[in-house]
């Protein structure tokens, strides 16, 4: 199983969109899960960008509040996430993108 931790994505929308496309391409080309984080107050912007930019069949795992009583770890396709939104504002979150 291969993965890459890429840290933070760009804050500016067009640069973030470009980076998401690059990461999705890497996930498919190398069967490599792409792991990234965001500052808690920008999580919702990143989440909305992910579901707007990625292909419907791409898988996204959202791991929130890890090791806290409010922990949630949810995986689904982008198509599933479009129907099942989540509130991530001010919550520590790790995002995982894979094929």
Task: Identify the residue ranges that each predicted region occupies.
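Class I SAM-dependent methyltransferase SAM-binding "motif I" and its flanking Rossmann-like core
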Residues: 1-26
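A contiguous loop/helix-start segment that scaffolds small-molecule binding in enzyme catalytic cores
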Residues: 29-99
